[in-house]
Amino acid sequence: VGFKAGVKEYKLNYYTPDYDTKDTDILAAFRVSPQPGVPPEEAGAAVAAESSTGTWTTVWTDGLTSLDRYKGRCYEIEPVAGEENQFIAYVAYPLDLFEEGSVTNMLTSIVGNVFGFKALRALRLEDLRIPPAYTKTFQGPPHGIQVERDKLNKYGRPLLGCTIKPKLGLSAKNYGRAVYECLRGGLDFTKDDENVNSQPFMRWRDRFLFCAEALFKAQAETGEIKGHYLNATAGTCEEMIKRAVFARELGVPIVMHDYLTGGFTANTSLAHYCRDNGLLLHIHRAMHAVIDRQKNHGMHFRVLAKALRMSGGDHIHAGTVVGKLEGEREITLGFVDLLRDDFVEKDRSRGIYFTQDWVSLPGVLPVASGGIHVWHMPALTEIFGDDSVLQFGGGTLGHPWGNAPGAVANRVALEACVKARNEGRDLAREGNEIIREASKWSPELAAACEVWKEIKFEFQAMDTL
């Protein structure tokens, strides 16, 4: 058969409903909204083609390779319940399409040009199944949950953090003072805000020095290991590594990176540096909502979370379920499990489209942060469990008596919740009662309870199934 020029329907080559997926395939679940008149099979096949080997017309050079070996295949299509003209298209990609150890390359293929494709009104990547054969080519998180606990010598409870506010405008010395007060009051960590890099009012080196001094002083006075997430995010990879090197020279335990604005290549480089040099790595997800908030277009956060676990990070922000930022409970717990656990079963009620086996890739601690305060502590302890970081920015620094009492209030509330849970009490039902009891012997907690007793952020969640 000679070369036949011309345009062929995608589904003739790329829609293969009888295909049996291989253990080594990367599987993707796309939410497809075809243009009027485009059948779902053609839309699904087009996604498979455009994100793998296909282009809009037959090309002569197709004959020089084995398309059957390399093409993506749309192997199943199902309508989305309750939505008109929306389908979930399942696509299988052969492993050989991807460079080993490169999240950048994986995403460039799977969520690259295809998202601008005219035959689709909208396209959203809901989930990815990463096969062990591919997972094994990644280092993953620099240390993981168990190693972090051993480094910090903290067990049996969530960790407590606080983002230093106002996020922009403080001088380095005043910033360091706030860090010291929070850590001295009983928090485990304080945090640079995601947009604190190296601005005219506070250059990075000055901030690093004052924060290091603050945390060593707090450490000496409390006998607990303390950390401050020093944001190493910078305009170039070289500058980022330079900042991480300086943090290591100061002897601090943890640095931080904005992985989406910084990019996966930079993030993976930093994760490798952190493992080689014993630094923990805190990841902030600034820009995620640009990608994941639209229900029918973009990428779900669970995909960004999986990508981060492969690229590397020891903590990542993951919504609160109860605060001011997005997060529906079951869906949030779904990707929290994908971050922490070795093996997660497929469970569509939690938005998990595929069984995910991480083999021996270390886990990532989910960070709950954004509009939370002492009254949320029982719910957060119950929802996230011990392996999490609970971060109270305004909920610490907004305390009427100042930063250190704000930290005391949060620590007392947390210890009370953990104690109550260990005694078998039901945090969901008795939460308010537990906090009230604890506030009787902690004036700091009592003052915090009074300030925030009426504050709620009640809006309809966008991230529904």
From Swiss-Prot:
Q: Which GO terms describe its molecular function?
A: magnesium ion binding; monooxygenase activity; ribulose-bisphosphate carboxylase activity
Q: Which residues carry this modification: N6,N6,N6-trimethyllysine?
A: K4
Q: Explain the post-translational modification.
A: The disulfide bond which can form in the large chain dimeric partners within the hexadecamer appears to be associated with oxidative stress and protein turnover.
Q: How is the cofactor bound?
A: Binds 1 Mg(2+) ion per subunit.
Would you kindly state one Gene Ontology biological process term found in this protein's UniProt entry? reductive pentose-phosphate cycle
Q: Which residues form the active site?
A: K165, H284
Q: Does the keyword Metal-binding apply?
A: yes
Q: HAMAP family, per this entry?
A: RuBisCO_L_type1 (MF_01338)
Q: How does it assemble?
A: Heterohexadecamer of 8 large chains and 8 small chains; disulfide-linked. The disulfide link is formed within the large subunit homodimers.
Q: Which family does it belong to?
A: Belongs to the RuBisCO large chain family. Type I subfamily.
The protein's name: Ribulose bisphosphate carboxylase large chain
Q: What is the lineage of its organism?
A: Eukaryota, Viridiplantae, Streptophyta, Embryophyta, Tracheophyta
What gene does the UniProt entry assign to this protein?
rbcL
